[in-house]
Design a protein with these regions (language model features):
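NAD(P)H-binding glycine-rich loop region in Rossmannoid oxidoreductase-like domains
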Residues: 38-106, 116-123
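Mid/C-terminal beta-alpha module of Rossmann-like enzyme folds, strongest
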Residues: 199-262, 273-325
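Hydrophobic ligand-binding cavity/cleft-lining segments
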Residues: 290-384
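Substrate-positioning beta->alpha
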Residues: 95, 159-160, 179-201, 207-208
């Protein structure tokens, strides 16, 4: 009898390890395949840990082939290349869309996604809006999605809990901005993992969304005080109601050592009460979870508590200078990626004049030249076999400004709501010295996409304008 196969995206994170352990304890133990963008020699309970770049649809298709279930635990809040242009929300969306597409192609039965609690508030932060957008992208291609929405997951190695611990450790007095008065219904790591295990392969959970959390919902300032008590480091509290979100991000990053890219979206999401609407899944599974105090004590007492959270670690410097650049631009009503790619090729020859000359042939291969140059600076070739109406792909196949790479590419894809187009360059390796690339070609690319976005909106401006006006 062939075992079920479960693929875990984000397997090497602290939640991923716990979920892997929970799934491995099933009586009919499934094959567990972990995906990672980093090292594959990490110890874990999975059967295989395979390298996979979630930004590559090809990689994801190969990774989920033969799987029956996919567990998605990925949040792209940290750099995935030497240079990254684009918001974490757009990066997250591309990864989720690739998983949704690949899962549908492979006949995957269910995707289980651990997202964030969504408050009843129209003014959601970019972080929480992104979580909801990821849910939509995972299910946009027909695979049943089970979403578990959680606030803070408390456990050893958890970046959010580690931020609280480091604030208590390092500050002589606790600075309490106004957002610390909001409530958070946190959940302990083991209960979160057990609930994911509970819904994987359970047909009644297909297509369902559940809020999960512990039995209490303390204020953030009370959570900080609780951690101080458990560490025997009681600190006097100083209320600072006028501390802006921007200043909060700066001082939290400075004090804790957490990357600013990680702190910023987390701080933004703390301006809401993060509480469950109900806990029906936990009632059904008989997994009420621990109080915050119990969860915090367990996390602090864990033998793993000295481990540095994965989100705090700097990614190893890549052997090549990889570039990832993503822009979100408005898409006219009723149009798709195929139309946008055709329009891009039609627009290029005149759209970059007088800065660049672009020749486009009948096969939609675009060659970029300096105004009077004879050798192309960049060559893009349309990938017919890898393109569809809602995703168009071009490979970078040559030019003086590009090093040879079989993975460098430009793509256009439509967002799940159909209102925007994501234009993305992935794994591009420039031939220019790094310092020169950053102050020249990297800036030109952003300006080109800004101008194309303006063209789609029916307006235009000069390529080398110094305007900083946002276009999307």
């Amino acid at each position: 009898m062939v075992r079920d196969s479960i693929v875990i995206a984000g397997a090497t994170g602290f939640v991923g390890h716990a979920v892997t352990r929970a799934l491995a304890q099933r009586p009919d133990r499934p094959e567990i395949v972990g995906l990672t963008r980093g090292r594959t020699d990490v110890a874990g309970a999975w059967d295989r840990l395979v390298p996979c770049d979630l930004f590559s649809l090809k990689d994801v298709e190969a990774a989920v082939a033969g799987a029956r279930h996919v567990v998605y635990l990925v949040h792209s809040m940290l750099p995935s290349a030497r240079l990254v242009q684009g918001s974490f929300a757009d990066l997250d969306l591309i990864c989720a869309d690739n998983v949704g597409r690949a899962a549908a192609c492979a006949g995957v039965e269910q995707i289980v996604y651990l997202g964030g609690l969504i408050p009843d508030d129209p003014g959601l932060s970019a972080h929480l809006t992104s979580r909801r957008e990821v849910e939509a992208a995972l299910g946009a291609h027909g695979v049943a999605v089970t979403t578990l929405r959680a606030g803070m997951v408390v456990g050893p190695g958890g970046s959010s809990f580690q931020i609280i611990k480091k604030l208590v450790d390092r500050l002589p007095a606790m600075v309490l901005p106004s957002w610390t008065a909001h409530r958070c219904q946190a959940i302990d790591l083991e209960t979160a993992a057990a609930l994911i295990d509970h819904v994987v392969g359970r047909p009644s959970a297909y297509g369902q969304t559940y809020d999960i959390g512990g039995p209490d919902a303390p204020r953030y300032r009370d959570m900080i005080a609780t951690v101080g008590e458990l560490l025997d480091r009681k600190r006097p509290a100083v209320g600072v109601p006028l501390l802006t979100p921007h200043l909060s991000r700066l001082w939290v990053s400075l004090i804790t050592g957490a990357p600013a890219a990680l702190v910023a979206p987390l701080i933004e999401s703390l301006h809401h009460d993060m509480v469950c609407r109900d806990r029906r899944l936990q009632d059904e599974a008989r997994l009420p979870g621990k109080t915050f105090r119990e969860a915090a004590r367990a996390a602090l007492e864990s033998a793993e508590r000295k481990a540095k959270p994965a989100a705090y670690r700097r990614a190893p410097r890549p052997r090549q200078v990889g570039v990832r650049s993503v822009q979100r631009i408005p898409l006219p009503s009723g149009r798709d990626a195929e139309w946008a790619a055709h329009e891009y090729m039609r627009w290029l020859p005149g759209g970059l004049w007088p800065g660049l000359r672009v020749d486009v042939d009948d096969s939609r291969t675009a060659s970029f030249f300096a105004l009077h140059g004879k050798r192309p600076l960049l060559v893009l070739r349309f990938a017919t076999e890898r393109s569809s109406s809602d995703r168009q792909l071009f490979y970078v196949v040559g030019g003086l400004l590009a090093k040879h790479s079989e993975r460098g590419r430009l793509e256009f894809r439509v967002t799940p709501d159909g209102h925007h187009l994501l234009t993305a360059i992935h794994e591009y390796v420039p031939a220019l010295p790094w310092w020169l690339y950053r102050i020249s070609q990297a800036l030109v690319h952003r300006l080109v996409m800004r101008r194309f976005g303006a063209h789609l909106r029916g307006s235009d401006f000069a390529l080398f304008s110094l305007s900083r006006r946002r276009t999307a």
